[in-house]
A protein has these predicted regions:
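Short amphipathic alpha-helices in soluble, non-transmembrane regions
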Residues: 53, 145-150, 194-201
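Short secondary-structure junctions
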Residues: 90-98, 151-158, 205
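N-terminal, polar/charged subdomain of small-to-medium soluble alpha/beta proteins
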Residues: 1-130, 134
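Short, surface-exposed acidic-centric catalytic microdomains
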Residues: 48-60, 151-190
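Flexible, gly/pro- and Lys/Arg-enriched active-site loops
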Residues: 43-48, 127, 170-177, 200-291
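Short beta-strand-to-loop capping motifs
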Residues: 40-42, 134, 184-187, 224-227
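N-terminal beta1-alpha1 ligand-phosphate binding loop
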Residues: 125-153, 162-166
Length: 291
């Protein structure tokens, strides 16, 4: 019987700091001691075999990031402090695939006897793919700006993206051609929060769309989220028609030919059996796109 391999872990335990986080005025003036514990989940086998720091993470660098947050600008809630630590660590150390952050107030201003008041959060990194499309305004600029927003966004990291492809419209054909691409991100947002963030990017970049198949300034579709299958009023993942459309499969295949759909077929296999005869033209090579 095949058993799923457990994650290797690194522990940064009982890190003590003095900070000014809290809701009460006295906490922000006088400060108090805090204790932080981190559990990092990542593959340590290669580091162990090669005895090479480049194959793991630098504890000192992580400690310094935590210290700057704990001794830096005051936050009202421990929840906020913990989230900022998770964000900073996961953004800067791509080898980490799971992270537990515990932040404790050892002398919280609460009557009674206790060891500490603490918040603990867990964030796991998931790979997701996003389809990008535009056929209004400066289409190339729209996709470029969308990629920049993904690269700079909270709780995710842009890992890869395809070239930009010129494609003919589907459904309502009396409109300009589309420019399409696919991006790969690693995120610790939930699927719902990731969808909300994509909609924020669309709105920020002035999305205009008056009908379902009509022209739009920018369209961002969540194609998949890890290995999850989600069917809800707001979200269907994997995207229900992604494997029927050349404008999705061609750029998707460029960056993830071996991604496996829940049906058991890979992107490459879907592309090989695609019946969509829509013309796809390479418009902007990947090497011409700078993020």
């Amino acid at each position: 019987m095949n058993q799923q391999r457990q994650s290797d872990r690194i522990y940064l335990s009982a890190m003590d700091f003095y900070g000014y986080h809290g809701v009460l005025e006295a906490e922000r003036i006088l400060g108090q001691p805090f204790q932080v514990d981190l559990t990092l989940e990542l593959d340590l086998q290669r580091a162990g075999l090669l005895d090479d720091l480049n194959e793991t993470v630098n504890y000192a660098q992580i400690y310094e990031q935590v210290r700057q947050i704990m001794e830096g600008e005051p936050r009202a809630l421990l929840e906020k402090v913990a989230e900022e630590i998770a964000e900073e660590v996961l953004k800067n150390f791509s080898k980490i695939k799971g992270l537990t952050v515990k932040v404790a107030k050892q002398k919280a201003p609460i009557p009674g006897h206790f060891q500490a008041m603490a918040v603990e959060i867990y964030r796991t990194v998931t790979k997701a793919y996003i389809g990008l499309g535009s056929n209004l305004g400066n289409k190339e600029e729209n996709l470029q700006k969308a990629l920049e927003c993904l690269n700079d966004g909270p709780s995710l990291s842009l890992r890869d993206y395809s070239a930009f492809y010129l494609t003919q419209p589907v459904g309502f054909t009396e409109q300009d051609a589309f420019l399409n691409a696919v991006a790969e991100v690693e995120t610790w947002l939930t699927p719902e929060e990731l969808l909300r963030f994509l909609q924020e990017i669309e709105n920020k970049l002035g999305r205009l769309r008056k009908e379902r198949w009509g022209p739009r300034t920018l369209d961002l579709d969540l194609l998949n989220y890890g290995n999850e299958t989600i069917i809800s009023e707001k979200l269907i993942v994997p995207h229900e028609r992604m494997y029927e459309r050349a404008f999705v499969l061609v750029p998707f295949h460029e960056i993830a030919p071996h991604w496996i759909h829940p049906s058991g077929l890979s992107t490459k296999q879907y592309l090989e059996q695609l019946e969509d005869e829509q013309a796809i033209v390479l418009q902007v090579p990947k090497e011409s796109i700078t993020i």
